[in-house]
């Protein structure tokens, strides 16, 4: 019987898993309605080092504003305000 439970670990009390703090939509919190595609410094907050748009699960943005951010980033890229691809953008 001891051989069957050799790889299994049991705890008497459940482990406390620290949950990350609640993500929030910064646009809803601060009341921003329009995302300006002509402001590349603000849009860089939603891009990673390679210039890719960060997903909602990382930024905490709501679906409505994530779509608007994506559209603004695409417009800024088209006008050459933001690069399509880059190395070490930040």
From Swiss-Prot:
Keywords, in A-Z order: Ribonucleoprotein, Ribosomal protein, RNA-binding, rRNA-binding
Gene name per UniProt: rpsR
Coiled coil: none
Family label: Belongs to the bacterial ribosomal protein bS18 family.
Phylogenetic lineage: Bacteria, Pseudomonadati, Bacteroidota, Bacteroidia, Bacteroidales
Annotated protein name in UniProt: Small ribosomal subunit protein bS18
PANTHER family, per database record: 30S RIBOSOMAL PROTEIN S18, SMALL RIBOSOMAL SUBUNIT PROTEIN BS18M
GO cellular component: cytosolic small ribosomal subunit
A Pfam family matched in the record: Ribosomal_S18
Organism: Porphyromonas gingivalis (strain ATCC BAA-308 / W83)
């Amino acid at each position: 019987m001891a051989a069957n439970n050799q790889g299994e670990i049991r705890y008497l009390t459940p482990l406390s898993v620290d949950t990350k703090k609640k993500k929030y939509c910064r646009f809803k919190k601060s009341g921003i309605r329009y995302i300006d595609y002509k402001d590349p410094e603000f849009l860089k907050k939603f891009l990673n080092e390679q210039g890719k748009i960060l997903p909602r699960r990382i930024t905490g943005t709501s679906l409505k504003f994530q779509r608007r951010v994506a559209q603004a980033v695409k417009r800024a890229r088209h006008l050459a305000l933001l690069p399509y691809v880059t190395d070490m953008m930040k």
